[in-house]
From Swiss-Prot:
Gene: POLR3C
Keywords, in A-Z order: Antiviral defense, DNA-binding, DNA-directed RNA polymerase, Immunity, Innate immunity, Nucleus, Phosphoprotein, Transcription
Subunit structure: Component of the RNA polymerase III complex consisting of 17 subunits: a ten-subunit horseshoe-shaped catalytic core composed of POLR3A/RPC1, POLR3B/RPC2, POLR1C/RPAC1, POLR1D/RPAC2, POLR3K/RPC10, POLR2E/RPABC1, POLR2F/RPABC2, POLR2H/RPABC3, POLR2K/RPABC4 and POLR2L/RPABC5; a mobile stalk composed of two subunits POLR3H/RPC8 and CRCP/RPC9, protruding from the core and functioning primarily in transcription initiation; and additional subunits homologous to general transcription factors of the RNA polymerase II machinery, POLR3C/RPC3-POLR3F/RPC6-POLR3G/RPC7 heterotrimer required for transcription initiation and POLR3D/RPC4-POLR3E/RPC5 heterodimer involved in both transcription initiation and termination.
One of the GO biological process terms: defense response to virus
Presence of keyword Phosphoprotein: yes
GO cellular component terms listed in the entry, alphabetical order: nucleoplasm; RNA polymerase III complex
InterPro entries: POLR3C_WHD, RNA_pol_III_RPC82-rel_HTH, RNA_pol_III_Rpc82_C, RPC3, WH-like_DNA-bd_sf
An example molecular function term from Gene Ontology annotations: single-stranded DNA binding
Protein name stated in the entry: DNA-directed RNA polymerase III subunit RPC3
Organism in which the protein naturally occurs: Bos taurus (Bovine)
Residues modified to Phosphoserine: 194
Chain residue ranges for the region called Disordered: 197-230
Superkingdom: Eukaryota
Amino acid sequence: MTQAEIKLCSLLLQEHFGEIVEKIGVHLIRTGSQPLRVIAHDTGTSLDQVKKALCVLIQHNLVTYQVHKRGVVEYEAQCNRVLRMLRYPRYIYTAKTLYSDTGELIVEELLLNGKMTMSAVVKKVADRLTETMEDGKTMDYAEVSNTFVRLVDTHFVQRCPLVPATENSDTGPPPPAPTLVVSEKDMYLVPKLSLIGKGKRRRSSDEDATGEPKAKRPKQTTDNKEPIPDDGIYWQANLDRFHQHFRDQAIVSAVANRMDQTSSEIVRTMLRMSEVTTPSGAPFTQPLSSNEIFRSLPVGYNISKQVLDQYLTLLADDPLEFVGKSGDSGGGMYVINLHKALGSLATATLESVVQERFGSRCARIFRLVLQKKHLEQKQVEDFAMIPAKEAKDMLYKMLSENFISLQEIPKTPDHAPSRTFYLYTVNILSAARMLLHRCYKSVANLIERRQFETKENKRLLEKSQRVEAIIASMQATGAEEAQLQEIEEMITAPERQQLETLKRNVNKLDACEIQVDETIFLLESYIESTMKR
């Protein structure tokens, strides 16, 4: 665990959950697994606050616990899961593009709350969608429920591990902590619920003096009497499935850039056919026959079977080897080599970074060393057609930044420089790790800058929010246009300009965070894929 990762985890925990949770989370990341009282003692936090912080972290899958032989429960932080919080906007946006606003809100609620029952998610999302609709229109629970089922069917949402029924029925003393188990066959099994109803608006005409709707209290009392139909069955967002989707999108985009749109559509079809059957960490997709691929092509994609076979042959013969042929039955069996695809994407990312940092001539040398595997300095000068002095400077720059490495091969046992070959080479895995570390530092800097910008303009932001609240309440009571105009003028022209600048800067920083995270995702996927081999 590097310092850059710990710092980024600290910033993310503080931004999402506050100082106490951040303090406990970072302590566990630094020290490893620890029991409750040791955490309280080492952090100087009260036992009650530590318990609450751990509850929050466990609810969001950021901390796991383990019962040891002597009955001691130890808590361990999941640093990689904390870093995933950086990707929350991307998960939510993906759900929106695939399953519209309903899917977006379902995934958002699950990410914000960590774990929820299906009935609670459906009711909350229906209420939120009803809020945004015109007066008189409401969102039906059944519609939200259908979208939830579709998300489960495509494995974007999955069940949380449960306490087994046998553990609850034991007559002996309860264990210090429950053992959670997950059944593979039930992980994507949706309980049969008859959710009948419509979303409710938060503000309605029958609100009483306290501002609480009358319909709310009876609902709570009935909930106490009637058991919730899916009580105890909790759901969470399946982040690995989202990562699989991001990886597939990156592969399709790479094929489209290298070849053409038809090739990318064929690869997209192959990935879609095997998305649920292929495990997230598998190096290859399941083999698919040419006939199966032809039948599964999108409606309206008018290409003949012969043309499809030609495209598949082209893809299989391509030097990048994204698609491989694994047999001849069924018109030819084809697989997508996910490991090779991730390797190519990581290499392209490294090349792009070298070009941006050091210029096109350095990128030429980098690609040359990458292609030839091992080269002496003289060979680099000759092949790249760059003067000796410039080539030496460029090689040293990249060597000092760890983009390329130097390998010594001695002719004699004494390692004398005059009798040693010095070969330049590119270790993609090592370079990817170095770049990933820099990306973590970049994101931490972006978050700190955004927080600084917001803090510097805190007074102005508070004033703007107060004015907006006054205008909203006056509009609700039917105030005249002149009165509204007078309130709006409370914010002067220079202040308005300052707010616009702040908004523009924060939007830029947010966009940068998401773009850097895309690079982080590619590098992490490649490193993970390489380590599994």
